[in-house]
Design a protein with these regions (language model features):
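Acidic/histidine-rich catalytic neighborhood of metal-dependent amide-processing enzymes
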Residues: 1-37
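Metal-dependent amide/peptide-bond hydrolase catalytic core
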Residues: 30, 37-232
Length: 232
């Protein structure tokens, strides 16, 4: 849509207001974190551990992981990587590791480390990603980085956010640590994330929304449409 839609281009040019529908318990959200996936792969030669004709993929992954642990600890403790606007105020650097060894006495032919971090507005994570790539080069680990979603930010003092608060009868806007489609529509200046239901009930096995929230949300969306589209 962002790359090919002419309608979206017109929306950007005309200053269209945007409401990203997500379960916020009808709270007005003016900022959220982004998302970045890192996939690091090391390769070896699978074989029975009693033979010399094998090389464990874990051996090149281990020193790489040591550097990733150092980055993890750094972003958890150093203020320059944190933003107190959010809870938690960190990048939430998560590390998962898995190899393909079928048994304890068989060396791993491939080991994969998947990492996930949540960038925040005002913090440039590219220096960290560069360090990950450099660590991969040093240890023979292939690194692939995917930017899944950008950060989302609108000034809490903007007229649009303040009007939204009045319509929703909320005292102040909030931030959340998850991501939404709002991270894609970055060229829309006036925007909020807003909707019925709770994020704790969304994306679960038994995903649900209360009828009360659904009814309130329907009424609120209608109210916002009348206000901004019909001038009422």
């Amino acid at each position: 849509v962002v790359e090919e839609s002419q309608l979206y281009r017109e929306m950007v040019q005309n200053g269209t207001k945007g409401i990203i529908g997500e379960p916020t318990n009808l709270e007005v959200i003016h900022a959220h974190k982004g998302s970045v996936e890192i996939k690091a792969t090391s390769r070896g030669v699978a074989g029975h551990s009693s033979s010399r004709k094998n090389v464990s993929a874990n051996l090149s992954m281990i020193p790489f992981l040591q550097e990733m642990k150092a980055i993890h600890d750094e972003v958890e403790t150093e203020v320059k990587w944190q933003n107190d606007m959010f809870e938690p105020p960190t990048l939430s650097w998560n590390i998962n590791v898995k190899d393909d060894s079928p048994a304890l006495n068989v060396t791993a032919g491939k080991t994969i480390c998947r990492m996930y971090l949540r960038p925040m507005p005002g913090i440039d994570v590219e220096p960290l990603l560069t360090r990950v790539r450099q660590a991969g080069d040093r240890h023979g680990v292939k690194v692939r980085i995917n930017h899944w979603g950008n950060t989302f930010f609108a000034s809490s003092d903007s007229d649009f956010v303040q009007d939204s608060l009045k319509l929703a009868h909320r005292p102040k806007s909030k931030t959340v640590s998850y991501g939404t489609d709002g991270g894609v529509f970055t060229e829309i200046a006036d925007k909020i994330v807003f909707g019925p239901g709770s994020i704790e009930q969304a994306h679960t096995i038994n995903e649900w929304i209360s009828l009360e929230q659904l009814s309130l949300g329907t009424d609120m969306y209608a109210k916002m449409i009348r206000h901004w589209c019909c001038g009422k």
